[in-house]
Amino acid sequence: MADVRTAPRYSIVPGDPVEHKREWLGLADRNLPFAVQGREARYSKYYEDNPLGPAKFFLARDSQSDTFVGMAAIFQTQLRVFGELVPAAVAGDFAVDDGHRGLGPAVPLQRAAVNALGEHGLSCAYGYPNEHSEPITRRVGYTDLGRLSRFVKVLRSRVVVEQYVQSRGLARLAAGVSRVTLDPLLWAA
């Protein structure tokens, strides 16, 4: 897919997981919440090693600085709809650098991601936009079907301990104790 021109200042470029990894990591560091597993591990998991295929992502290039200032992605998945598996995507990793928001590349980035759905045989996409990106996702055709509640059953207390205990040594000690004392209770509940 060739570069798609948006406004004179920005162009939307299809991302390449090998060629654009450094740019993605930079945009993520500047704009996205910290990934619990770390940025490199998250990138590998979703952009390089996803068993359903690598993420399809797009970058916005600022022609004035010749730098990438935004990104949007879709992650292939499967949904079960009325008993049938449907090829779908999760929309995510949507970020635009400060100073390029507003009338910048946000809408063209999301349009590129939505257009990629059909090109890759995906039937639909869903996402979890924050309050700042909701108007943009609506503008490109997403519909709010309702709120999603996630229910999680923790089976290993180590995951929770490592998330909240800052000291690595203390986290390791607490995880060891919780493995013996809490994990059996978690499995029984």
Question: What role is predicted for each listed range?
Answer:
Residues I136-T137, Y142:
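Conserved active-site tyrosine of GNAT-family acetyltransferases
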Residues S63-V69, A73-F82:
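Acetyl-CoA-dependent GNAT
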Residues L117-N130:
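Conserved GNAT acetyl-CoA-binding A-motif
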Residues A2-F68, A89-V90, Q163-A189:
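Short amphipathic alpha-helix that is part of the acyltransferase structural core
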Residues L79, T143-Q166:
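Conserved catalytic-core motifs of GNAT/GCN5-like acyltransferases
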Residues L85-D98:
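Conserved acetyl-CoA binding element of GNAT-fold acetyltransferases
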Residues V96, R101-N115:
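Conserved acetyl-CoA-binding loop-helix of GNAT-fold acetyltransferases
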